[in-house]
């Protein structure tokens, strides 16, 4: 399974998002520190979930990072997260 699919599957299972985008930005970082042959090392995640209600931005990011701990310990070098509630997302 590719890394983007693993990220999508784990976030979908754990956070029940109303919207989820997983963007592989690895090509933009080719040749930089942490880049891997074949990419799949730099990602952006945009997620909207009602589970974020009442949580600070930091707490939301920590929840996403905890959900993806295995990927962050291995193939993922960089992860940018935008985590919003349904009301914030509009």
Segments and roles (model prediction):
Residues 1-36:
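N-terminal first-folded block
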Residues 55-89:
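C-terminal structural segments of small proteins and small subunits
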Residues 23, 46-48, 80-84:
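Solvent-exposed beta-strand sheet faces enriched in polar/charged residues
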Residues 16-18, 39-43, 75-79:
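A generic structural signal for short beta-strands and their flanking turns/coil linkers
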Residues 47-57:
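A short interface-forming secondary-structure element
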Residues 31-49:
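A short, structured beta-strand/loop element
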Residues 1, 89-90:
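Basic/polar N-terminal segments that are highly enriched at the extreme N-terminus
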């Amino acid at each position: 399974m590719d890394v983007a699919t693993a990220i999508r599957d784990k976030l979908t299972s754990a956070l029940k998002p109303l919207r989820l985008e997983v963007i592989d930005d690895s090509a933009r970082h080719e040749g930089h520190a942490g880049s891997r042959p074949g990419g799949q090392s730099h990602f952006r995640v945009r997620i909207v979930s009602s589970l974020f209600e009442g949580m600070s931005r930091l707490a939301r990011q920590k929840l996403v990072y905890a959900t993806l701990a295995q990927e962050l310990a291995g193939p993922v070098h960089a992860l940018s997260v935008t985590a919003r509630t349904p009301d914030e997302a509009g």
